[in-house]
């Protein structure tokens, strides 16, 4: 037996240990040799010359044969694959898939639109439309919404065969060009402003390519949505073929412009009733007492009793009973300063929405949780025909006065669900609006957005309406 190793000395290796160490060293040397040879081989020019394949570049547009076979094509015509297959004569670019809104447009008109300069040609005579008194056309070409302006311009340039950005005033008496809703700016403004205008024929202006009717001013008043709806109904009875031909292309749409002074806000007769306060400082300085909602509820109940039968009153009372006690319980726990702050929040939010609504171009109306109307957009007045001075006065008007019977019942049912159930409170529905003309009702698709204050109590409802 070997003597034990002294302290501090390296132990003597055994033969088994030496064998394993040599084996590991051999494997390490072999791996290093393999890696070295692989690197040398990859850097050898001869190896690269025989193994490197040229990457085929993808072309933007394949030919018809390669497109049908789902194979890569090149930019040459005929391409290499068609030359190999003997298809040189029929090798051409594959047609692109057309957009959905271009399916009804003939290809000839698209080619003509692409390579020829546009010119003005009347397509439909104006005598097929119902006359309206003294319509005026102005030179500016902007809509209330800049997004809608660009969208209408783009679609008209694509769909219309004859488009010109500025129609010649001398041709306005001969007919209606396809781009009449894009070129003139039509405004329901007051007649007190001076502007350079020229008079068009006393007919309804219509863009035949987009089936778009113009809501503009007249010498005797404002041409509003209910007027055009009545005119279209008469046109359906007198010239059904014209309406049928237009409806095959698109649904009816409406456009409204503004005065050429660059102000996107349209001033309707009766003054500016958009907001009582012009600056946020005025709100915090002048709002010194809370808003009383009790008279609003009393006025709402009195109006409902005078208009609806008992059966419908029961349904509305059931809906109101679901949220009215919650309102009372929430407000009873608040102090007077809290109630003043709630009214300041309401006016401040209304001032912010005033700027948004002026730029959106969507018919909008804002009312309190009691149904009292607090704000009316100009587009809503154009849509319904109601003057803004009549909707926003010292005597509070109610939103239920602008809805038909069925829509009023549905409104209370919907409001009872979103008042405290859904925190966001935004929902889309349909309703029927009553216009200033008793025999005209407008079916609309609307979005009701419930805005809450800092205490989580419903503060205002913003309604956006679009006719359907």
Swiss-Prot record:
Q: Which residues bind DNA?
A: 63-91
Q: Which GO terms describe its biological process?
A: carbon catabolite activation of transcription; carbon catabolite repression of transcription; cellular response to starvation; gluconeogenesis; positive regulation of gluconeogenesis; positive regulation of transcription by RNA polymerase II
Q: Which GO terms describe its molecular function?
A: DNA-binding transcription repressor activity, RNA polymerase II-specific; RNA polymerase II transcription regulatory region sequence-specific DNA binding; zinc ion binding
Q: Which InterPro entries match?
A: ERT1_acuK_gluconeogen_tf, PAS, PAS_13, Zn2-C6_fun-type_DNA-bd_sf, Zn2Cys6_DnaBD
Q: Which UniProt keywords apply?
A: Activator, DNA-binding, Gluconeogenesis, Metal-binding, Nucleus, Transcription, Transcription regulation, Zinc
Q: Does the keyword Cytoplasm apply?
A: no
Where is this chain's protein located in or outside the cell? Answer: Nucleus
Q: Name one Pfam family in it.
A: Zn_clus
Q: Which SMART domains match?
A: GAL4
Q: What is its main location?
A: nucleus
Q: For the PAS domain, which residue ranges apply?
A: 349-422
> Looking at the keywords, is Isomerase present?
no
* Cross-referenced Gene3D superfamilies: Zn(2)-C6 fungal-type DNA-binding domain (4.10.240.10)
List the GO cellular component terms. Answer: nucleus
**Protein family per UniProt:** Belongs to the ERT1/acuK family.
* Described function: Transcription factor which regulates nonfermentable carbon utilization. Activator of gluconeogenetic genes.
The protein here is known as Transcription activator of gluconeogenesis ERT1
Protein's gene: ERT1
């Amino acid at each position: 037996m070997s003597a034990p190793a002294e302290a501090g000395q390296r132990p003597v290796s055994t033969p088994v240990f030496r064998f394993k160490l040599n084996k590991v060293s051999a494997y390490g040397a072999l791996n290093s040799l393999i890696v070295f040879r692989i690197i040398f081989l990859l850097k050898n020019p001869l190896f690269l010359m025989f193994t490197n394949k040229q990457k085929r570049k993808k072309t933007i547009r394949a030919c018809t044969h390669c497109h049908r076979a789902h194979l890569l094509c090149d930019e040459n015509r005929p391409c290499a694959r068609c030359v190999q297959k003997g298809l040189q004569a029929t090798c051409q670019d594959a047609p692109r898939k057309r957009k959905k809104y271009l399916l009804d447009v003939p290809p000839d008109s698209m080619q003509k639109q692409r390579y020829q300069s546009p010119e003005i040609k009347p397509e439909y005579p104006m005598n097929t439309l119902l006359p309206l008194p003294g319509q005026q056309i102005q030179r500016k070409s902007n809509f209330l919404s800049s997004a809608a302006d660009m969208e209408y311009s783009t679609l008209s340039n694509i769909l219309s065969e004859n488009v010109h950005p500025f129609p010649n005033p001398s041709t306005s008496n001969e007919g209606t060009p396809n781009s009449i809703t894009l070129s003139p700016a039509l405004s329901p403004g007051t007649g007190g402003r001076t502007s350079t205008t020229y008079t068009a024929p006393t007919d309804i202006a219509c863009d035949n390519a987009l089936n778009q009717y113009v809501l503009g001013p007249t010498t005797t008043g404002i041409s509003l949505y209910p007027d055009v709806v009545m005119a279209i109904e008469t046109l359906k009875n007198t010239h059904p073929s014209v309406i049928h031909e237009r409806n095959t292309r698109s649904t009816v749409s409406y456009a409204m412009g503004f005065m050429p002074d660059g102000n996107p806000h349209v001033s309707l007769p009766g003054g500016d009733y958009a907001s009582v306060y012009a600056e946020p400082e005025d709100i915090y300085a002048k709002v010194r007492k809370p808003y009383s909602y009790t008279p609003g509820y009393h006025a709402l109940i009195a109006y409902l009793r005078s208009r609806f039968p008992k059966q419908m009153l029961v349904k509305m009372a059931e809906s109101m009973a679901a949220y009215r006690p919650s309102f009372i319980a929430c407000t009873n726990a608040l102090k007077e300063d809290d109630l003043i702050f709630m009214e300041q929040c309401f006016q401040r939010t209304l001032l912010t929405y005033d700027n948004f609504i002026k730029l959106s171009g969507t018919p909008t109306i804002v009312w309190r949780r009691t149904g009292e109307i607090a704000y009316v957009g100009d587009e809503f007045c154009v849509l319904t025909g109601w003057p803004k001075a009549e909707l926003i006065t010292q005597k509070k008007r109610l939103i239920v006065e602008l809805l038909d019977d069925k829509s009023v019942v549905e409104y209370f049912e919907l409001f009872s669900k979103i008042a405290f159930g859904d925190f966001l409170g935004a929902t889309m529905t349909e309703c029927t609006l009553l216009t200033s003309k008793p025999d005209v009702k407008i079916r609309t698709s609307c979005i009701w957005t419930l805005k809450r204050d800092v205490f989580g109590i419903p503060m205002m409802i913003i309604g956006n309406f679009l006719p359907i």
